[in-house]
């Protein structure tokens, strides 16, 4: 169960990073 929780945490972290990169990239695209 500990591994499953850790895996979910890693997936959530990866999704958060991808969302952040897309958000910054979109803002940068519109500004520039």
UniProtKB/Swiss-Prot annotation:
Keywords: Chloroplast, Membrane, Photosynthesis, Photosystem II, Plastid, Reaction center, Thylakoid, Transmembrane, Transmembrane helix. It is a single-pass membrane protein. Gene3D superfamilies: Photosystem II PsbZ, reaction centre. SUPFAM superfamilies: PsbZ-like. The chain crosses the membrane at residues 12-32. GO terms for cellular component: chloroplast thylakoid membrane; photosystem II reaction center. It comes from the Eukaryota. Disulfide bonds: none annotated. The keyword Transmembrane applies. Its main location: plastid. One of its GO terms (biological process) is photosystem II stabilization. It holds the Pfam family Ycf9. It is found in: Plastid, Chloroplast thylakoid membrane. Belongs to the PsbZ family. PSII is composed of 1 copy each of membrane proteins PsbA, PsbB, PsbC, PsbD, PsbE, PsbF, PsbH, PsbI, PsbJ, PsbK, PsbL, PsbM, PsbT, PsbY, PsbZ, Psb30/Ycf12, at least 3 peripheral proteins of the oxygen-evolving complex and a large number of cofactors. It forms dimeric complexes. May control the interaction of photosystem II (PSII) cores with the light-harvesting antenna, regulates electron flow through the 2 photosystem reaction centers. PSII is a light-driven water plastoquinone oxidoreductase, using light energy to abstract electrons from H(2)O, generating a proton gradient subsequently used for ATP formation. This is Photosystem II reaction center protein Z. The lineage of its organism: Eukaryota, Discoba, Euglenozoa, Euglenida, Spirocuta.
